[in-house]
Amino acid sequence: MDYNGIDSSSVKTHVHLNEILNNDKVVNATLIENYILQLKNNRSIIFPDEQPNGSIGSNKFISLFIPTINSLLNGEHYFEIDPERVVISLLDAILAYLNIEEILSLYPLDFIINGLTGDSAICCMIIRLLRNNATSETTVKLFDETAILDTILSRYFEKNTTLNVVSQVELLISELVDLSSTVVSTKLLSTEFRDLYEHARDNEDKLVKFLDYILLLMPYILEKQFDLPKNYYVLSYSEFYENDDVLQVVLFIQFYSKLIQRINTFGNDTNIIHNIKPCLKDLISYFKTRQNDDIVQSFYANDIVDVLFHVSYSKVPELLTFNEEVVGQYELFKSYNLFLHLDCDIKLLSTFNPRALPLEIIEDILQEISIFNQKYFSILLNCIGSENVFNKLIPRLTTSVIGKLSFDMLYSLLLRMSEFEYSRKHLINGMPNIVSDYLANPPNVSESEIWNLKKDTLQNLLFSNTDLNVWHDPISKNFSLMCNGRKVQDILPQVDIADKSLQ
């Protein structure tokens, strides 16, 4: 074997692979894994002399390793001698340095398609290589003209597909969507896969995975105003209310939460919003049964609150209109529809956009609770996000009351106030004792969470447009101290005495 020009680690690894090939020895996983780390960090192991126009077939490293690895993978006992699949990982690390044309010169198309149906490690490797080369015209042509995508999606929707394969498929689809690849419209959203999609949509065991898949495509669908079949994202009444699988119902609710997030981010497709409105209304009706339904209260209510949270912060006109219905028509925030002994109701009031609620409703709620009680404190913090509500709260935010709060509550309050111009101004100009005692000349705090709350508050104040007046320098100094520490020459020397009787 001619190892001239090959580094010593590569020689050692190749010798080991040959020994395995000839004697069916068990693969030394540690040796291979350590070598893979070297390979990933050093391209020159494969390409010691860069030759941009050179053929991959003439590369000595490739000509040594690829045939040996192929022989091992095709061996009758491969999966017994390499239970951790490290040889596949080695091949993956090598091929990661090659473009799709070079890979195809080493492996025929049949190998790629067959590999997608084989061992999960090989399948993941192939999908990863396709994703890494997704911008290549050759890869796009492979997707358009071969059965590669058919094979990938068929495996994805199989009931027992391993999570690592599912993850790699989803990364590939996300990459194609992020690139706005023509493959999305010509293949993934074409009628070609309709039978596959319909089968997955109508299969109880595959439905959750199908909804996850639709979410992956949704940015492209929204931006391109693509007309997606309604039944792909609209769930029927029976799928929610006649479903005994609690976890599945939770995932259905989470689907709508994620769908609204995508609508808020990528576009205001009015057809999709119009079509999901009945589902959202059903969720609200479902939520209103929480007081008398333990399943709804324990498993569904908090996720429905997440849906309402994303609706409340939407800037999409049709969702804004729907939000008005949530507040007005469904009277969700009327005192007789709120149960503040339930965690889900506290979460609702702690997350729902306070600017999307009429002032009189919030005033009624705040009159019903002790805002400085630990249980309801998150509601107070949320309400500060509305200037109108904050102005109503000012008489209750007195120095004496705030000064009695625990440090975690106090600094959580100051951090929240530091996030908005109107509350920053009140903090700086209307609460001098609080600024002096807890921000300009703060007490020493060692607990990490409180320390971070204080630091973030100082940062918000310093990097805002608010005039800090006389507080700028002490706040700036304190922030610098928290970020960089105290200079050695500024530390007063002292000796700790363990026994006070010696003092």
Curated annotation (Swiss-Prot):
<protein>
    <recommendedName>
        <fullName>DNA mismatch repair protein HSM3</fullName>
    </recommendedName>
</protein>
<comment type="function">
    <text>Involved in DNA mismatch repair in slow-growing cells. Acts as a chaperone during the assembly of the 26S proteasome, specifically of the base subcomplex of the 19S regulatory complex (RC).</text>
</comment>
<dbReference type="GO" id="GO:0005737">
    <property type="term" value="C:cytoplasm"/>
</dbReference>
<comment type="similarity">
    <text>Belongs to the proteasome subunit S5B/HSM3 family.</text>
</comment>
<dbReference type="InterPro" id="IPR040752">
    <property type="entry name" value="HSM3_C"/>
</dbReference>
<keyword id="KW-0143">Chaperone</keyword>
<dbReference type="GO" id="GO:0006281">
    <property type="term" value="P:DNA repair"/>
</dbReference>
<dbReference type="Pfam" id="PF18795">
    <property type="entry name" value="HSM3_N"/>
</dbReference>
<dbReference type="InterPro" id="IPR041335">
    <property type="entry name" value="HSM3_N"/>
</dbReference>
<keyword id="KW-0963">Cytoplasm</keyword>
<keyword id="KW-0234">DNA repair</keyword>
<keyword id="KW-0227">DNA damage</keyword>
<dbReference type="Pfam" id="PF18794">
    <property type="entry name" value="HSM3_C"/>
</dbReference>
